[in-house]
């Protein structure tokens, strides 16, 4: 039986598996994910899930039953340590997965800032569920938060934090927020909108 191994349990990895089944592939499909949750939608991380208005299971693409019905095997909390393309094996800490076809769908990782106290408990990167869960432990009204980055995600987080009663400052390296993706007029609109909500924006 032909075996497809998908490394990455995000949007691309999950939809690769779904598409294979939809197109009639009847071989074995294995997804390896280093996260502890079924593949999920990430946009709510900076919105409803951040505001604790959405349960984790509501963000999942599909239920666990769906993967079982479609015979898609998912290995969560699993990190690939090495891949042998000669023998077609992917090696984890305690297992080995052979494959006929290998799909890399690992997505992106946030750029870590070179700074002192980089492991501080009040420094967060927003990329996955566990990041937001860590933030939930620190978020309380009237605290001050500094967001580095005035892109769409930064603005979404700022809006959520204002709703939660925090004092928010955005630091943007460019001359204006959203500079890389919008016109000056649109940037000014969002600048004014968030400023009126109480967000301090420094470019």
Where are these regions (language model features)?
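FAD-binding core/adjacent interface of flavoenzyme oxidoreductases
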Residues: 1-5, 63-146
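Beta1-alpha1 glycine-rich phosphate/pyrophosphate-binding loop at the start
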Residues: 2-73, 160-185
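Residue-level detector of alpha-helix initiation sites
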Residues: 11, 36, 108-110, 130, ...
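A Rossmann-like FAD-binding core segment of flavoenzymes
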Residues: 26-28, 74-91, 97, 164-203
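Glycine/Thr-rich phosphate-binding loops of Rossmann-like dinucleotide-binding domains
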Residues: 112-113, 155-156, 179
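Short, conserved glycine- and acidic-residue-centered signature motifs
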Residues: 125-128, 154, 183
């Amino acid at each position: 039986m032909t075996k497809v191994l998908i490394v990455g349990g995000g949007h691309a990895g999950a939809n690769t598996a779904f598409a294979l089944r939809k197109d009639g592939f009847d071989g074995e499909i294995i997804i390896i994910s280093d996260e502890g949750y079924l593949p999920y939608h990430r946009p709510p991380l900076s919105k409803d899930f951040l505001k604790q208005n959405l349960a984790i299971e509501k963000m999942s693409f599909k239920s666990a039953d769906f993967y079982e019905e479609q015979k898609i095997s998912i290995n969560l909390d699993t990190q690939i340590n090495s891949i042998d393309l000669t023998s077609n094996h992917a090696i984890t800490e305690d297992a080995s997965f052979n494959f006929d076809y290998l799909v890399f769908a690992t997505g992106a990782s946030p750029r870590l800032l070179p700074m002192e106290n980089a492991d501080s408990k009040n420094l967060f990167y927003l990329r996955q569920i566990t990041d937001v869960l860590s933030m939930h432990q620190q978020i309380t009204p009237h605290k001050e938060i500094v967001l580095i980055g005035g892109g769409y995600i930064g603005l979404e987080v700022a809006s959520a934090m204002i709703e939660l009663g925090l004092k928010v400052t955005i630091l943007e390296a460019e001359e204006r927020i959203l500079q890389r993706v919008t016109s000056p007029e649109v940037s000014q609109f969002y600048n004014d909108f968030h400023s009126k909500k109480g967000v301090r924006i420094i470019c």
